[in-house]
């Protein structure tokens, strides 16, 4: 009897979800293409741990790219991006930033996020949530030392990276304003975390984990190719 009740509940919820989904389907798909860009702070999660600056005290870098969004539903859409971004980490040698030496490592990536875009609110002004996986490839790396005359002992994390391919996940919160004639303006804060590693990781290697993580704030502009009737 309990199993039968559960089946009835599941069936009722399924029918309700299908009904809501059908009612919120658009008469015709919406297609957006645009650009976005902003600043990003990043750090690294190491195991064994490495003393690097946390994400809120790391130097800011730039990021930006193209945005494609496809929607057949009022709430959910698919968003694919192609971005250039920098991530890495910073290490402070000394008691403070003024008297000490800052070692900064920047990794330059081309990344492609595949995101589920969920929008809530009124037609013109809406909040949204983005969530999904992303892949990337490191096209260059650079090292900066604030005091070139300083002596910094070489450590494992100072070696050239061994894994240029990156994969991970991203989640963002934001809002946008949709005008009637000149497109969509949006603001988003996004957190990303790599599930791979910039160095070889595992039981046979020095690092068990060497994963970048970042927090970015971006402004964007999207143009709608098809207007709703």
Residues covered by each model-derived region:
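Gram-negative (and chloroplast) outer-membrane scaffold detector with strong preference
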Residues: 23, 27-31, 41-45, 69-147, ...
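Short glycine/proline- and aromatic-enriched beta-strand/turn motifs that initiate or cap beta-hairpins
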Residues: 22-67, 224, 229
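Bacterial Sec-dependent N-terminal signal peptides
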Residues: 1-32, 36, 215-229
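Residues that define the transmembrane beta-barrel architecture of outer-membrane proteins
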Residues: 29-31, 58-62, 106-110, 125, ...
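Extracellular loop and loop/strand-boundary signature of outer-membrane beta-barrel proteins
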Residues: 49-54, 97-103, 154-161, 203-209
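Predominantly the C-terminal beta-signal and adjacent terminal strand-loop region
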Residues: 164-166, 171, 177-229
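Short helix-loop boundary/capping segments
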Residues: 149-152
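Short glycine/serine/threonine-biased micro-segments
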Residues: 32, 36, 63, 130, ...
